Structures are given as C-alpha cells and as structure tokens.
C-alpha cells in the first residue's frame, strides 16, 4: 500500500499590541492574514502582544476583541496574552538561550556619547584621507553614511563583565551572517541580523521582555506556519528566525510582508501618526473598503460572515506582490 503523509494544518496568527485601537492599517493586516490562512484551510490565532506594560492598556485590548468580532474575524482557540507568559520567556532565557545572553549595564546616554565620538573620529579620518588624496571635501563636511559606525551594533562593552542578570538588562547575541528566506509577497530576502539589530536587549532591567523575543518563542510554541504582517516588521525577520533556531523551536515555513497602508499624503498609517480608529458601526462597508484597498475582487454587500466567505474563496496575493505601499488616495471617497 502507498504510504500517505498528512501535512500539518496551516496556522496563521494576528498579533496586535494594545497600545491603541485598531486603525485601517492594522485592520488590513488582520483581514489579509485571516482570508489568506482560511483560503488554505488553516487556523487563525489571536495573540495580544502586551509585554510593554507602560504603553499597553486593557481597554484597548477589549476594544480590539470587540472590533474583530464585529467584523466577523473570529479567531480559533483561546486568545494568548503575552503578559501572562513572562515565566515561559524567562525559562527559555535561562535555559536553551542562556549561552547567547549576557548582562549589560550600558545606559543610552553612554552609548550615545560613544557613537558620537566614533562618528566624529570617522569624519576626521575621512577628511584627512580626502586631503591626502587631493580630493575636495564638501563645505558641510558630511560623511558618506556607509562610512559611519553602525549604531545598531552594540560594541559589547559588557560581554565579559559577568554582571548580575537580575540587576541589569540582558542582551542576546544575534548571528553575524546573512540569513535568507522567501517572502511570498516581497520575494527573496537576505539580511544579517547582527548588522540590522546588533545584540538586542532581550529583557529590560525592569523585567520587560523584548517583543521580538516573545513573538519568536510564541510563534514556535504555537506552531505557527504562516505569518502575514506589515512590511515595517520585515527587518526583524532574520532575528526572529535565528532566535527560533537557537530556542530549538520550529521555524516559520511561509512569510508574507504586506505593503504599508498610507494616507493620501503618503504617510504610513500608525498609532504614532495618530491614525484614526476604525468605526465598526457599518462593518460590511468597512470590509468592502479594506478588501478593495488590498486589491481583491469585489464581494457582494452582505453580512460580514458571508462577505468574508466570498473573500476567502477568491483570495489572491498577486495584487500585493512586490508592492511597498497601498495609498488610500487610490480609492478615496469610497470608504
């Protein structure tokens, strides 16, 4: 008899941070990830990334859940709250990730002073070289950006200091080589996590866990296979891959980074830019608008559930491929 192999069910997720209500940018991410994973008969998980207790608010969490339900974006399984999983993250930090971590007492002020000195030295050296070669230097004496020190790379002052892990921040060493992956929307990607993020802070002195570390562990523990999220998170991806590998967790098999939603002025919609919260009083109209913004075929104006079923049946990533942004001006007046 032929041997049949059962492939694991695809699992996607939406993981908002409750530092504000959902806006059109976060809605399109939720909608795209929901329709895509459901179109391949997968599960859609909801995880609230609320490790930042200073900025996250329970009332925003509650509103996010209300808005998703009003739009028919119903999640599978129980909602995961990262604020309730701190012990899990610390267990990984103190066990399988321990060889990669070290305590650090460097303040931002100290590092800022160090980088400023390095940049001044680089500018002086560059000017001297230019003079020696009889090359004219611009009056403003600006230095090519590729010659400046990389401020993302922590200079590892504390890597051998053997400081207390409970009284200082904790850094994790990221690999200094290129990691590649195929992005289903943006194409083949290569990045060096050490060059991009350096030895990132995994846990602050007050115990707060870095969201990249928490997301990496949770994605592995939840056995997520497909991640569809905003393009602004793309630079974090190789760090996440390396952390999951170091933690001996299954890595993500399918990545998709969506183009960013921009207002008519070309500015990315975000909480920092005071993007307006979505209004779910007319959920069907809002879904139709978001689907059109995502380049999907029109759906019949109906209940959210029926509209989503139609959107799922005809979901297509092709209109999004290679796109860096989607501007609301293209369909302004139809919201």
UniProtKB/Swiss-Prot annotation:
EC number of this enzyme: 6.1.1.-
Gene3D superfamilies, per the entry: HUPs (3.40.50.620)
GO BP, sorted A to Z: glutamyl-tRNA aminoacylation
GO molecular function: ATP binding; glutamate-tRNA ligase activity; metal ion binding
Cofactor comment: Binds 1 zinc ion per subunit.
GO CC terms: cytosol
Positions that bind ATP: 271
Motif ('HIGH' region): 16-26
Motif, 'KMSKS' region: chain positions: 268-272
UniProt-listed InterPro entries: Glu/Gln-tRNA-synth, Glu/Gln-tRNA-synth_Ib_cat-dom, GluQ/Sye, Rossmann-like_a/b/a_fold
Chain residues that bind L-glutamate: 13-17, 49, 211, 229
Residue pairs linked by disulfide bridges in the UniProt entry: none
SUPFAM superfamilies found in the cross-reference section: Nucleotidylyl transferase (SSF52374)
Domain of life: Bacteria
NCBIfam families documented for this protein: PRK05710.1-3
Similarity section: Belongs to the class-I aminoacyl-tRNA synthetase family. GluQ subfamily.
Protein name: Glutamyl-Q tRNA(Asp) synthetase
Record gene name: gluQ
């Amino acid at each position: 008899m032929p041997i049949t192999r059962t492939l694991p069910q695809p699992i996607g997720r939406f993981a908002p941070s409750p530092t504000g209500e959902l806006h059109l940018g976060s809605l399109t991410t939720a909608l795209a990830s929901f329709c895509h994973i459901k179109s391949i008969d997968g599960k859609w998980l909801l995880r609230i990334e609320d490790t930042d207790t200073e900025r996250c608010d329970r009332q925003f969490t509650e509103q996010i859940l209300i808005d998703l339900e009003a739009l028919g974006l119903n999640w599978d399984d129980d909602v995961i709250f990262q604020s309730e999983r701190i012990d899990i993250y610390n267990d990984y930090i103190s066990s399988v990730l321990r060889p990669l971590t070290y305590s650090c007492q460097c303040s931002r002020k100290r590092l800022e002073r160090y980088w400023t000195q390095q940049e001044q030295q680089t500018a002086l050296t560059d000017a001297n070289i230019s003079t020696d070669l009889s090359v004219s230097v611009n009056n403003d004496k600006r230095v090519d950006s590729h010659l400046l020190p990389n401020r993302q790379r922590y200079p590892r002052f504390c890597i051998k200091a053997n400081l207390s892990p409970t009284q200082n921040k904790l850094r994790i060493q990221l690999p200094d080589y290129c990691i590649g992956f195929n992005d289903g929307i943006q194409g083949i990607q290569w990045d060096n996590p050490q060059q991009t993020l350096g030895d990132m802070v995994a846990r602050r002195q007050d115990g707060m866990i870095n969201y990249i570390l928490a997301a990496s562990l949770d994605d592995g523990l939840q056995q997520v296979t497909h991640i569809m999220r905003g393009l602004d998170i793309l630079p974090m991806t190789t760090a996440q891959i390396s952390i999951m590998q170091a933690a001996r967790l299954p890595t993500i098999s399918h990545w998709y980074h969506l183009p960013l939603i921009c207002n008519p002025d070309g500015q990315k919609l975000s909480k920092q830019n005071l993007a307006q919260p979505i209004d779910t009083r007319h959920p069907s109209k809002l879904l139709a608008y978001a689907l059109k913004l995502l380049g999907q075929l029109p759906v019949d104006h109906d209940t959210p559930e029926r509209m989503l079923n139609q959107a799922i049946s005809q979901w297509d990533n092709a209109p999004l491929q290679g796109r860096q942004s989607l501007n609301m001006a293209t369909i302004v007046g139809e919201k």
